[in-house]
């Protein structure tokens, strides 16, 4: 009853109240609806914005980042924008972004707070830039005021999507920042890699930077937006943005492809890539927008220079195109330079910077690769490229003979195809196994070698060396790995360098190149296609194509291969022929003509392929040996194989060998008419200059074939060389491929003199001719040593190379220098003798110088092609490369570069690593620079550069390996190195090198990846990937390691063994080749085999085997070990590692018991610790030579080191020096005991014995030393190694002591400085420590080790992982790496800084660790992404990575980017595939992504794979994200639409006004504005946000909010994630943030319009209260106040107690009225609640409470308007 009574009165009151309240709320309600509906519209985009806000909250949460991963980045962008907004806020805000930004700001802060902090900082600045951009937008915004225009603006927003770029722009502005970032780069550098990524974005950024201007432009774009230019920009942006980034991704990739398609268009594409650059270019078109961008250009002026860089990229463009980012990288490199600058010397590197430019090129290589997004393209290309690489891989595989390896390797199927060809090539080559026959011939070789007699021993060693030389075919390293592959392989390379055995792998590579040849064969078929395509790849690769080209030239080789194929076939037949090359040996004389052929080179390739036949060819190589001789010294190197690092050096020369491989091209040379092309080749050089046109060159590449033709002419020369061979072979000049080089010379090398040198070489050749007498060659080899001395002079040449650096300048002259190198060439010719290789190693140095100059050349790298021309010296290498140049020509000269890179590897290293090296080389320079003298060395450098080369070789490898990846790879590189360890094994593995190559291969796989390595991006990207792959590489390596080594070896071993059988005979050849390789591979086993090899081989290969064993131990123990020790020494702990390395050696030797030995080595390690002092000693070691003498005693100390024996072993050779020490020998004995340990190594002992013979071999090692001398040069790299080498050199003296090694000592002096470098290397040791750390990394690689082990197992596979385990002690692989590190040390030095830089990568290493798991890491790569995340810390790491970046930065910062991105990419890598798309996209993503990833996004990066999906969308998403941000902006537009809907709401002008006024902000801010309603209450504002959940009924204003809220809600619905979920967050968490929003309240200013009504409400409140009182009075009067009141009173109270009806009813009324249920609900509650209280008090309180609370609630815990406006108590309550 009462209730009923009350109800009437009550209802009356309610009705009255509603009547009072209803209207405005009513309107609101409608409004809300309209708004709501609109909201829905808003929801989509708005939500995004809102979402962004919410996300922002989330973003703050960080999950947002994840959530917004894309959006995040979007948000990040927005966030950045937000930050910008924060900065710019107004303008940014103006876009709905503000709303987001408000939140975003908080988020940004928060977000930034994330890893983004650094990044954020960058991003921040980036943001700031963006902010500026936004400001532009703001202006636009104003324009935007017009809803429609605003919509246009939305287009602008789209433009903003451009701003995606804007986001990127932010990043881009980052670039601007980056420009600022120039310093930023430092920061960026730190962030660098991140930034670099950004840089990548940078080119993007650059573009962005341009975009910075872009931003300006964007501002302009703003106007442009207004202009709709935005629209254009929008599309531009979209295109650019999405397309841009996407284009970048796609474009780069696409354009990359395009690039590939039209080198010219590539330029255009470059434009597209430009969009990569093109982003810039697109920016360029953006620039068109860039007209504004024009200012951009202006802005970019720095960027302009950036652009210039881009321009550099120009030619770069193709390169740049990819390089674009590369440029970016280069820019990054620029900043890279900055980074390089970071690198400091890096900057020097920057000079290397030009290196960077080179890097750009390399970068291009990388970037290309990176861009390889085209990477992908390349990758695709690479795919075939990979195939190529794979081929390289398979090549390795092939090398593995692995032919089956090939089969196994390929798998490398596409490779297989290549592989098949390669396979056959391999097989053929491997068949070169029958080459064994050749080895038989090698036997004759031996016979020849016999003439080589001891040479035979040496030669045998050489022979195997030759095999090694073949291996030395780092040849592969040269181009093959070279792509960056070499770099990478090189990485594995330098690891491989150790890999040099790696190069051995390279040999595999050579095989590779052989394969390449084969591959080319494959690609040959593919070749033109590939070549063309390769060229594309080349284009893409830029250098990559270089690599690819190399592969391309490979193609050229392929062309060569064509004939190569013929050769390959020839190789096959070659095998047969070479095989016949057995007679080939006789043919070797013929091969001499082979040399003439260079066919010898050709067969060289064949020989290289043959390399096994090399042995045969070796006989063939005879000239091959000449080359082989180079290989010979290579062989020496092979002996050096211990030096194998030396070999690496040799590999450097190996590269020369590679050059030879290039000669392989020369084989192409066979192209005869191809010769005519030669002129072209000369032109090619021009083409090389064309390098930019690289693509053109790629075309040229086709002409490359022409080049090959040139090579052909080379052939002609060769042909002349033909008979020349003998005569020409004196043309050894042919080896003087110099003739090629000569041709190359024609290129520049007109080495001609080189030929003359070749004449020298000729003598070399003569030796070569002697090569027939190979023995003579051997003698020459001796002279080879002399040549080595020449190499020493090589060092001198290296000095020249140093000059080389000068030469670098000279490099053109480099060619000339190369001519100087001429001696270089002579050396190069010697390369023919292998001294050339050594010289080449020297020249490699030269090449390195070239590589260094390569840096220059690299700079030249565009000229890289030119370099290739320059490579001329490169050509020397190139010479060999000459055809390489030809290839290089084809390669652009890139191949040349690549070949050169081979030395070119150095180049490539430089180039491939070139970039990296450039970075490394750069850092190499940096590292070298870090090496300081390294840089100096670099200059020396070049001399050292040889080191650099070696270093770069290593560096190259490291660099390449590090490139960062290599570093990572370095880790895995280590693994690879391990593999390299196995490298020795790898040498076998060489087959496994195939593994290594394979690793290289996988390296190749990485290579393949490397192929993608060719993708280089892969390298860079895969580089990371490579690293990852390295990881997996390792795994692969492991697999491969085992695969190649075991498998390969086993298989190839089988094959090898098979060959091994004949290998026995073949084994000699193969053994050394495979055996050496194989032995190197199984080294122990092969060593054992080698042992048997020795036994079997021993007979023939015997010494060969010994050499092989030596090679095995040699590689492992002596040289490597020595330098390794030095490295180890350098490594100090590295030593430990070195010890491990020792075991590595030991491992190699015993390797198993060696492990014991390794254990001993462990004590070795202790000794090594001593070795640590050894390091000192090592330093002394540098003087070590002298010291070595001293070292002798030192060595005695070393003797302690003796246990260092490894050192001793190496030391053994060291001992050899020591041997000079004699006691050292005793020490060696100690080493002997070490050896004994080694003996324990048993086989090691045997090896040791061999090692002894090693000593002998070491003597060979001596020649090894010579090689080492070369290694000396290598040693220079070895520097530590050098000193080690020096020691070895001493060993050189050891051997001959004779060797110019003495001069080697001089070289050593250079080495000394190298030692200084070594000292640097010492720091290298630090680095080595880093390397050690690398070891750690390797340890990290632990699994890496495992991987390393795997690599180890690679070694392990090869050797007893035990030692491997010891080796696994990471160092094993590390040791290997260390060995590599030895040279690696140089590399480590390079790597050191590289490592250091890379090492910074250590986290990278971590990545490497990841890499360790890397295989997993590939997944781990995801973790890599984690690493990337680590990269996030990477960002921190990146800071470190920054240095990494520095390295990476240079490394492509790309690499870093790749690394960062790389790991990022790894994420990207995961993204990798992402990368493929993402490469651009990924990097794009990385770019944008980096921002995103920059923060968490890295995690997101993990998502990035998702992002990958996103990536496509990512790109889109990112773009979208950006556009998402843009979209948000667009959304804003949507908001605008919403606003328009608001307009529907606008029907309710009030809303409309706020909406319009609010604009984007409008909706939300409108909500905020309603908040404004409670002026001064930011919380209220927050509340408003909060309100959203509650669908508050704010009168119209709130309604608007509600609307907004609803919209949000809808948005949420749409957004699902965002708004609502975020809301609370926004409200609660972000509340402060919202306060910022409150700050953003500016919108609130808009809001006030809405406020108006709210004000009305306030009026109503009073009215209501008054009305209530009035009503009460009225009711009382009407009903009888008392009675009714009582009735009401109790009922109310009861209602309060149990009266749900009123509550429900009131609620119902609320709903009916459409009022915020909360309000009445609260009211109802209040009444109910108040019901307990007195009506007056209760009502008041309750009502006040309820309403106040309700409203308050609506507003958020305002506690009310009531509190503020009504009863303190009620409100307060």
From Swiss-Prot:
Residues 248-258, 547-572, 1466-1485, 1615-1639 have a biased composition (Polar residues). Residues 1-26 form the signal peptide. InterPro entries: Mucin-22-like (IPR053330), Mucin_dom (IPR028199). Residues 27-1660 are extracellular. It is found in: Membrane. Residues 178-243, 262-357, 440-481, 490-546, 755-1025, 1064-1465 have a biased composition (Low complexity). Induction: Up-regulated by poly(I:C). Its main location: membrane. Residues 61-102, 176-357, 372-405, 434-572, 590-674, 754-1026, 1064-1485, 1603-1639 are annotated as: Disordered. Keywords: Membrane, Repeat, Signal, Transmembrane, Transmembrane helix. Expressed in lung by serous cells of the submucosal gland (at protein level). Detected in the placenta, lung and testis. It comes from the Eukaryota. Residues 1682-1773 are cytoplasmic. Pfam families: Epiglycanin_C. It is a single-pass membrane protein. GO terms for cellular component: membrane. Residues 153-1514 are annotated as: 124 X 10 AA approximate repeats. The chain crosses the membrane at residues 1661-1681. This is Mucin-22. It comes from Homo sapiens (Human). The gene is MUC22.
């Amino acid at each position: 009853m009462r209730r009923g009574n009350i109800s009437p009165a009550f209802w009356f009151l309610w009705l009255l109240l509603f009547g009072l309240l209803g209207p405005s709320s009513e309107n609101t309600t409608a409004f809300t609806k309209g708004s709501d509906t609109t909201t829905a519209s808003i929801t989509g985009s708005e939500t995004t914005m809102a979402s962004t806000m919410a996300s922002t909250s989330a973003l703050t949460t960080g999950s947002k980042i994840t959530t917004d991963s894309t959006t995040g980045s979007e948000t990040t962008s927005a966030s950045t924008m937000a930050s910008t907004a924060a900065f710019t806020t107004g303008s940014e805000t103006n876009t709905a972004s503000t709303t987001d930004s408000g939140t975003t700001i908080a988020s940004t802060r928060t977000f930034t707070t994330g890893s983004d902090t650094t990044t954020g900082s960058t991003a921040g600045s980036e943001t700031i830039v963006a902010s500026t951009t936004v400001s532009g937008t703001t202006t636009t915004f104003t324009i935007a005021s017009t809803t429609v225009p605003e919509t246009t603006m939305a287009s602008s927003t789209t433009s903003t999507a451009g701003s995606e770029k804007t986001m990127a722009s932010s990043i881009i502005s980052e670039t601007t920042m980056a420009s600022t970032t120039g310093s930023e780069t430092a920061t960026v550098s730190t962030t660098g890699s991140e930034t670099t990524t950004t840089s990548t974005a940078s080119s993007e950024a650059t573009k962005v930077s341009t975009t910075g201007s872009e931003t300006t432009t964007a501002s302009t774009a703003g106007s442009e937006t207004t202009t709709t230019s935005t629209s254009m920009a929008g599309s531009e942006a979209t295109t650019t943005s999405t397309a841009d980034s996407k284009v970048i991704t796609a474009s780069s990739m696409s354009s990359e492809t395009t690039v590939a398609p039209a080198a010219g268009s590539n330029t255009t594409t470059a434009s597209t890539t430009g969009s990569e650059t093109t982003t810039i270019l697109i920016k360029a078109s953006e620039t068109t927008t860039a007209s504004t961008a024009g200012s951009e250009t202006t802005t970019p002026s720095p960027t302009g220079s950036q652009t210039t860089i881009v321009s550099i990229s120009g030619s770069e463009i193709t390169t740049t195109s990819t390089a674009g980012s590369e440029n970016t990288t280069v820019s990054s490199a620029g900043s890279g330079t900055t980074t390089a600058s970071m690198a400091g010397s890096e900057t020097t590197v920057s000079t290397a910077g030009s290196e960077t430019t080179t890097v750009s090129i390399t970068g291009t290589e990388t970037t290309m690769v990176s861009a390889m997004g085209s990477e992908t393209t390349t990758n695709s290309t690479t795919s075939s490229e990979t195939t190529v690489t794979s081929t390289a891989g398979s090549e390795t595989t092939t090398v593995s003979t692995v032919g089956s390896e090939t089969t196994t390797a390929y798998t490398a199927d596409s490779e297989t195809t290549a592989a098949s060809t390669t396979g056959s090539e391999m097989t053929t080559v491997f068949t070169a196994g029958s080459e064994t026959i050749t080895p038989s011939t090698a036997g004759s070789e031996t016979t020849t070698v016999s003439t080589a007699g001891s040479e035979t021993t040496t030669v045998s060693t050489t022979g195997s060396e030759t095999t090694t030389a073949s291996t030395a075919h780092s040849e592969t390293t040269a181009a093959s790995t070279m792509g960056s592959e070499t770099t990478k392989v090189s990485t594995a390379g330098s690891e491989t360098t150790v890999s040099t055995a790696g190069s051995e792998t390279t040999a595999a590579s050579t095989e590779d190149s052989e394969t390449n040849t084969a591959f080319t064969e494959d690609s040959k078929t593919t070749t033109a296609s590939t070549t063309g395509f390769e060229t594309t790849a080349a284009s893409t690769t830029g250098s990559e194509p270089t690599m690819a080209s190399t592969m391309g030239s490979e193609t050229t080789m392929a062309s060569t291969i064509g004939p190569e194929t013929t050769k390959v076939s020839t190789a096959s037949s070659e095998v047969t022929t070479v095989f016949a090359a057995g007679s080939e040996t006789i043919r070797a004389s013929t091969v001499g003509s082979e040399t003439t052929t260079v066919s010898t080179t050709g067969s060289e390739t064949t020989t290289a392929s043959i390399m096994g036949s090399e042995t045969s060819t070796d006989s063939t190589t005879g000239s091959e040996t000449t080359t082989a001789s180079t290989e010979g010294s290579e062989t020496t190197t092979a002996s050096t194989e211990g030096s194998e690092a030396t070999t690496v050096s040799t590999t450097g020369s190996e590269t020369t060998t590679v050059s030879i491989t290039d000669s392989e091209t020369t084989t192409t040379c066979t192209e005869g008419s191809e010769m005519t092309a030669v002129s072209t080749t000369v032109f090619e050089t021009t083409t090389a200059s064309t390098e930019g046109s690289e693509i053109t060159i790629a075309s040229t590449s086709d002409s490359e074939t022409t080049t090959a033709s040139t090579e052909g002419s080379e052939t002609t020369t060769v042909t002349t060389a033909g008979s020349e061979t003998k005569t020409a072979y004196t043309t050894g000049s042919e080896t003087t491929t110099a003739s090629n080089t000569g041709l190359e010379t024609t290129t520049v090398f007109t080495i001609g003199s080189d030929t003359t040198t070749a004449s020298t070489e000729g003598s070399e050749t003569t030796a070569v001719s002697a090569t027939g007498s190979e023995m003579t060659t051997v003698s020459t080899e001796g002279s080879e040593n002399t040549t080595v001395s020449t190499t020493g002079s090589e060092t001198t040449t290296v000095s020249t190379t140093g000059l080389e650096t000068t030469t670098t300048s000279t490099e053109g002259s480099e060619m000339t220098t190369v001519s100087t190198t001429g001696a270089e060439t002579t050396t190069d010719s010697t390369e023919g003798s292998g001294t050339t290789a050594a010289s080449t190693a020297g020249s490699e140095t030269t090449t390195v110088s070239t590589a260094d100059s390569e840096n220059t050349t690299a700079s030249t790298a565009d000229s890289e092609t030119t370099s290739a021309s320059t490579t001329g010296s490169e050509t020397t290498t190139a010479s060999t490369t000459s055809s390489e140049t030809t290839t290089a020509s084809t390669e652009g000269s890139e191949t040349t570069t690549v070949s050169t890179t081979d030395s070119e590897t150095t180049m490539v290293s430089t180039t491939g690593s070139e970039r990296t090296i450039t970075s490394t080389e750069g850092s190499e320079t940096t590292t070298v620079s870090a090496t300081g003298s390294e840089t100096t060395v670099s200059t020396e450098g070049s001399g050292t550069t040889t080191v650099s080369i070696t270093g770069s070789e290593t560096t190259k490898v490291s660099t390449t390996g590090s490139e960062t990846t290599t570093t990572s790879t370095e880790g895995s590189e280590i693994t690879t190195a391990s593999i390299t360890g196995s490298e020795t094994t790898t040498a076998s593995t060489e087959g496994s090198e195939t593994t290594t190559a394979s690793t290289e291969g996988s390296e190749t796989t990485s290579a393949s990846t490397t192929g993608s390595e060719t993708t280089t991006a892969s390298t860079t990207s895969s580089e990371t990937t490579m690293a990852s792959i390295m990881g997996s590489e390792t795994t692969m390596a492991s697999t491969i390691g085992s695969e190649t080594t075991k498998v390969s070896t086993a298989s190839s071993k089988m094959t090898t063994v098979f060959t091994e059988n004949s290998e026995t005979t073949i084994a000699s050849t193969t053994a050394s080749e495979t055996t050496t390789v194989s032995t190197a591979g199984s080294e122990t086993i092969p060593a054992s085999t080698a042992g048997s090899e020795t036994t079997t081989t021993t007979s023939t290969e015997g010494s060969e085997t010994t050499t092989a064993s030596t090679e095995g131990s040699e590689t492992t123990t002596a040289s490597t070990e020595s330098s390794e020790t030095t490295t180890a020494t350098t490594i100090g702990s590295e030593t430990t590692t070195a010890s491990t390395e020792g075991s590595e050696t030991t491992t190699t030797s015993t390797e198993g018991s060696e492990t014991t030995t390794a254990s001993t080595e462990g004590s070795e390690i202790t000794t090594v610790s001593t070795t640590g002092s050894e390091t000192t000693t090592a330093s002394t070691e540098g003087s070590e030579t002298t010291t070595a003498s001293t070292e002798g005693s030192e060595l005695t100390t070393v003797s302690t080191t003796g246990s260092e024996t490894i050192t001793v072993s190496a030391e053994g050779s060291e001992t050899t020096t020591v041997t000079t020490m004699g006691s050292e020998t005793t020490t060696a004995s100690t080493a002997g005991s070490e050896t004994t340990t080694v003996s324990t190594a048993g086989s090691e002992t045997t090896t040791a014995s061999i090692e002894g013979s090693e000593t002998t071999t070491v003597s060979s090692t001596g020649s090894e030393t010579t090689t080492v001398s070369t290694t000396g040069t290598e040693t220079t790299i070895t520097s530590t190694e050098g000193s080690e080498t020096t020691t070895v050199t001493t060993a050189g003296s050891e051997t001959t002591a004779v060797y110019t090694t003495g001069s080697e000592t001089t070289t050593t002096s250079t080495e000394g400085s190298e030692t200084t470098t070594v000292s640097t290397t010492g720091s290298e040791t630090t680095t080595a420590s880093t390397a050690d750390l690398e070891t750690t990394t390797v340890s990290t690689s632990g699994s890496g080790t495992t991987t390393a082990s795997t690599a180890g197992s690679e070694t392990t596979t090869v050797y007893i992982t035990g030692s491997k385990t010891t080796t696994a002690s990471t160092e094993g692989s590390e040791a290997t790496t260390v060995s590599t590190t030895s040279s690696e040390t140089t590399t480590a030095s390079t790597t050191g800084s590289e490592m250091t830089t890379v090492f910074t990568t250590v986290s990278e290493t971590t990545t490497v660790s990841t890499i360790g798991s890397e295989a997993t890491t590939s997944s781990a790569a995801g973790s890599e992404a984690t690493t990337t995340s680590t990269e996030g810390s990477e960002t921190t790491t990146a800071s470190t990575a920054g240095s990494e970046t520095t390295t990476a930065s240079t490394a492509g910062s790309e690499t870093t980017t790749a690394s960062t991105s790389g790991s990022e990419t790894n994420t990207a890598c995961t993204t990798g595939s992402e990368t493929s798309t993402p490469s651009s996209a990924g990097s794009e993503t990385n770019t944008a992504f980096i921002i995103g990833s920059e923060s968490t996004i890295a995690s997101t990066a993990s998502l990035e794979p998702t992002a990958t999906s996103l990536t496509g969308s990512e790109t889109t998403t990112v773009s979208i994200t950006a556009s998402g941000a843009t979209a948000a902006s667009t959304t804003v537009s949507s908001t605008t639409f919403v606003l328009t809907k608001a307009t529907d709401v606008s029907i309710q002008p009030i809303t409309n006004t706020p909406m319009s006024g609010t604009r984007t902000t409008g909706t939300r801010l409108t909500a905020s504005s309603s908040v404004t309603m409670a002026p001064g209450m930011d919380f209220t504002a927050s509340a408003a946000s909060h309100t959203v959940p509650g669908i508050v009924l704010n009168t119209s204003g709130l309604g608007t909010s509600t609307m907004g809220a609803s919209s949000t809600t809808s948005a949420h619905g749409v957004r699902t994630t965002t708004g609502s979920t975020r809301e609370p967050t926004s409200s609660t968490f972000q509340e402060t943030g919202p306060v910022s929003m409150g700050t953003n309240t500016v919108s609130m200013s808009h809001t006030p319009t809405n406020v108006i009504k709210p004000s009305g409400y306030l009026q109503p409140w009073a009215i209501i209260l008054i009305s209530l009182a009035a009503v009460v009075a009225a009711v009382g009067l009407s009903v009888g106040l008392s009675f009714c009141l009582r009735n009401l009173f109790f009922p109310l109270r009861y209602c309060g107690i149990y009266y749900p009806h009123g509550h429900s009813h009131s609620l119902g009324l609320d709903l009916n009225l459409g009022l915020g249920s909360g309000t009445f609900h609260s009211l109802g509650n209040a009444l109910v609640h108040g019901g307990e209280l007195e009506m007056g008090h209760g009502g008041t309180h309750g009502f006040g409470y309820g309403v106040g609370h309700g409203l308050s609630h609506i507003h958020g815990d305002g506690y009310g308007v009531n509190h503020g406006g009504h009863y303190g108590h009620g409100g307060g309550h």
